[in-house]
Amino acid sequence: MMSLDVIFILKSVIIAIVEGLTEFIPVSSTGHMILVGNLIDFKGQFAEMFEVVIQLGAILAVVVLYWKKIKDSVIEFFKFIFTGGKEGKIGFRFGMNVIIGCIPFAIIGVLFYDNIKSLFNLQSVIIGFIVGGILLLVVETLFRKKNHSTDNIDKITPIQALKVGTLQVLSAWPGMSRSASTIMGGWIAGLNSPTAAEFSFFLAVPAMVASSGKDLFEFDYSIMTPTLWIALVVGFIVAFIVSIIVMEKFVNFLKKKPMRVFAVYRIIMGVVLAVLAFTNIISV
C-alpha cells in the first residue's frame, strides 16, 4: 500500500515539474499537464484540483520574483487615489493596465466557464498546439520587429493593455497557452518581447487566482486522504521552485532570441499527438 502512495506522490511531482517548466513559456502548461497526466495515468477529480493548486504555486513565483514591483505599485495605486492624483501616477497607471488587461478574459470566463471546462481533453490540446504554433509563427513574423518602442512595463498604455488582454482570451482554449497569447498581443500592441513576457506574468496573477478560486471552492474535499494532502503540498512547492527558475531564464532568452523554436515545437508536438491518436496508440 505504501509503495502505491509513494508512486502517486512521484506522479504528482512529475506533473508539478511540467507545470513549472511550461506555465510561463509559450507552449501551454494546461496542454502538457493533460498530455502527461494521460501518459502516467494521473487523472480524475483530484488531478483536476491538483492542477489548479500547482498553478497557484507558479503564480506565487511571480509574486516572489516581482515582489518589489507589486508592493510599490499597490502603494502608489492607493496614493494616487487618496492624494487626488498628486502622487503615485506610475503605480496607478500600471495597476489600471493590469485591470484593463484582465477584463476580456474575465468576461469570457464568466460567460463561458462550463464550455471552457468541457474543452479540457487531449483532442482540444492537439488543436491548440497546432493552431497556436502557427499563430505564433505568423504573428512573430508580422509584428515582432515592427514598431516595438515599448521596452518597459511602466510605459504600457491602456490601449496596449487592452490589446494584450484581448489576445489573452485565446488561452481559454486548452493548448493555446496564456503566455503565447499575451506575448502575441504584446507584439501586436507594440511591446518588445521581454516587456510582453513580463506583462504576461503580471496578468497571470489576477486571471489565474480568480479562475482557480471557483474550482477550489467547489471541490469535494471529503475525498482527501493523507497521501493526497502530501501530494498537494509537495506539488505546490515543486511548481513554485521550478517556475522561478524558468521565468528568469525565459526573459533572458527573449532578450537575445526569437520564439519560433517554441512555435515549431508546438506544431511538431501537435502533429505527433494527432498521428498517435489517429492510430489509436493514445486515446482522445
Swiss-Prot record:
HAMAP family: Undec_diphosphatase
Annotated organism of origin: Clostridioides difficile (strain 630) (Peptoclostridium difficile)
GO biological process, one term: peptidoglycan biosynthetic process
EC supergroup of this enzyme: hydrolase
Organism lineage string: Bacteria, Bacillati, Bacillota, Clostridia, Peptostreptococcales
Name of the featured protein: Undecaprenyl-diphosphatase 2
Extra information: Bacitracin is thought to be involved in the inhibition of peptidoglycan synthesis by sequestering undecaprenyl diphosphate, thereby reducing the pool of lipid carrier available.
Gene: uppP2
PANTHER family to which the protein is assigned, alphabetical: UNDECAPRENYL-DIPHOSPHATASE
NCBIfam families: PRK00281.1-4 (NF001390), undec_PP_bacA (TIGR00753)
Cross-referenced InterPro entries: UppP
Pfam families assigned: BacA (PF02673)
Catalytic activity: di-trans,octa-cis-undecaprenyl diphosphate + H2O = di-trans,octa-cis-undecaprenyl phosphate + phosphate + H(+)
Membrane topology qualifier: Multi-pass membrane protein
Function summary: Catalyzes the dephosphorylation of undecaprenyl diphosphate (UPP). Confers resistance to bacitracin.
